[in-house]
Amino acid sequence: MKGICRTVINAVHQSKCDNMEVRDTMRIAAMVFMLIILVGLFINTERQIYKWLAMIFQGLNRPVSGMVFGLLVLTILAVFVVSRIPGMGAYGTLFLIDHYALGFLSYVVIITNAVSLLLFALRLTHLIQFPVSRSVRLVSAALSMLLAVGLTVFGAVHAANIQIRRYHVRLGQEQAGMETIRLVLLSDIHLGYVIEEKHLAKIVSAVNALKPDIICIAGDIFDGDITSLANPGKLMGLFGKMESEYGVYACLGNHDAGDGYQQMLDFLDGAGVRVLMDEAVVIDRSFVLAGRRDSSPIGAHGDTRRKLEVLPDAGPLPVIVLDHQPGNLDEYGSETDLILCGHTHQGQMFPFNLITNAVFDVDYGYYRANATAPQVIVTSGAGTWGPPLRVVTDNEIAEIDLLVPHLESEQE
C-alpha cells in the first residue's frame, strides 16, 4: 500500500512539474512572439514617419532618420527601465517626464500603424488611388500626430481626476436583522515618482467624503520602490488621515515588494493600516475579512503565499477576501462570499483595456460566474503605472454598500 501511495504521489508531483514546464515554455514563447510583433510595429512606425518627414524636408537621409528615431525610442525605454531601480529618487523629475514620453510614444506607435493599416485596406478596396497622393499622406500624418498629442494631454488631465464607482452587494441569504456596512475599496495607488502628495491628498479627501465604515486596499500601494518617495513621512501622515469606524485593512500587491519591503510595512503600520497576510479578522461580528499575499511579487515579499485559513470562530459569517490579482479566482469556492481585487488597471489606456478584458475572466467591475460562485469586484485603481495617463478608463474609488447579517441578530 505504501508503495502504491508513493507511486501515486510521485506521479502527481511529476505531472505538476510537467505542467509547470509547459506553462513556462508557453510563457516564453508568448513573450518572444510579442517581442517580434513590437519590433515590427516600431520598424513600421519609423518607416511611416520617415515618409511623412521626407515630404517636408527634401533630401532627408533615411539611415540618419532611422538612427535618430531608434535612439529616441531606446532612450525613453532605457530611462523607464532605470526608473525601476531602487535608490534613484534624485532623478525623479527626469523619470516623470520619461513616463509621459512613454505614453506619447505608445500612441504614436499605435496610431501610426493603425493609419498605415487603414491606408493599405483603402488601397486594396480601390477607395483611394495607388500610390497614395501627397495630400492624403500629409493629412494622415498631421491628423495622426495631433491625435497622439491630444490623447496624451487628455489622458494626463483625466488621470488627475478620481471617479467614484458604486456597488450594492448582499452577502449571504436575505433575512431579518440585516445591516448595511459601507466598505470603500482602493487599489493600485502606486506611490512613487508619479503618484505623490497631491494625488494622495485627493484620494484621502474622496475616501473620507464617502463616510466609510471600513476601508480596504487591494494591493499595489507602492510602485516597487519606497525610496523614490520625496517625503515618505508626509505621505504616511496623509495616509493616516483616512477615517472609518472599523479601520483600514490592506493586502499586498506585486509591486509592494523588493528591497524596501520592510520599509513599506513600517510605512503602513505608521499610517494605521493593518496588512493581512494570508490571515483573517472578524469585522463587527458581521463578516470575516481576509487578505492574501500576492501570488507573483516583483522582488522580496516576505514569506511565500500559503493556504488561507479562515478564523475558526467565524461561524456562519460571510467571508470577504482581499486578493490583489483577479487571476487567482479559481482558488475560491462557495465558502467565499466576495472577492475584492485590483491589479488590472482595466488596461489603463485604450486599446490595452481590450487586452485585459481578453486575458482575465473579469478585468473590471462586478462579476459572478454562477449562483454558487463568489461575487467579485475588480477596481481599476486610484493611480497609474507607467505612463500617467487614463484613456477610456478612470482612476477610481469603489464605494460598496454591503448588506450583511449581524451575528447578534441571529442569536436573539
PLM region descriptions:
Residues 160-173:
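Alpha-helical transmembrane signal-anchor/signal-peptide segments
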Residues 2-160, 409-411:
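Non-catalytic terminal accessory segments
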Residues 23-24, 30, 64-67, 71, ...:
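A broadly tuned "polar low-complexity/structure-edge" signature
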Residues 170-412:
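Soluble catalytic domains of enzymes that build or remodel membrane lipids, polysaccharides, and related
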Residues 49, 128, 164, 244-246, ...:
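Generic preference for hydrophobic/aromatic residues in regular secondary structure cores
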